[in-house]
UniProtKB/Swiss-Prot annotation:
Native organism: Oltmannsiellopsis viridis (Marine flagellate)
Location of this chain's protein in the cell: Plastid, Chloroplast thylakoid membrane
Classification of source organism: Eukaryota, Viridiplantae, Chlorophyta, Ulvophyceae, Oltmannsiellopsidales
Superkingdom of origin: Eukaryota
Family per record: Belongs to the PetL family.
Protein name: Cytochrome b6-f complex subunit 6
């Protein structure tokens, strides 16, 4: 059970990181 929670947490952090990087690139392109 703990492994599932850890996996979901890792997946969520990776997804959030990807979104942050994507938004950063969009802001750079807009400027």
């Amino acid at each position: 059970m703990l492994t599932v929670i850890a996996y979901l947490g890792l997946l969520a952090s990776v997804l959030i990181g990807t979104i942050v990087i994507y938004l950063g690139l969009v802001k750079v392109k807009l400027i």
